[in-house]
Amino acid sequence: MTETPLPGLPSAWLLGSPGRVLRVVLASAAVAPPGTGAAQHRAGRDAVGAALRRAGSPVTSVGRAYSGAPVCPAGFPASVTHSTALAVAAVAPGARGVGVDLEPRCPDLKLHRFLLDERERAELWPRGDPPGLRRLFAAKEAAFKALSDCADAHGGLFWRVRLGLRDGRLWARAGDRYALVGELAAPAFALAVAVTADP
């Protein structure tokens, strides 16, 4: 595996609610040129394996579910995201779910109409700027992955996951389940990590 650190990518992130802080371990891997789908998936598996190792898992090889999500050992939920150049994996030992998303490009601004509801636009995207929408797109996608077992609440559609601020932290909700979202934004990308937690 060729580890390619994303500038500013921490090796671990602490997310959680008071009294229950969860460690999310991150790892990245370069995607072999020319960045085909198969190369992205290989890099993703490599990144998940590295994150599992760092998290203390006795098993570091991963399978792949029909949905494309990594199949990991019990107690070590994982998520992966990739572009044509880089894969990033997150593992959250002991959590119910974890999600990660990397967005190198800003989405079309017209997407805000179905991506965000009126409250989310007012609270989280008041400037209406492209980097802000990219950041929220990544946050919703990461939260959707963390809350993947809430299909009855979000219908399998990531934009139905709702975001909001609580005590200065970004939370996601699908039905009665919550995930805490951490964000890392730079001029060239937005990265979000979400872990299931109780507010």
Give each language-model segment a name:
Residues M1-P199:
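Core catalytic alpha/beta fold that binds nucleotide/phospho-ligands
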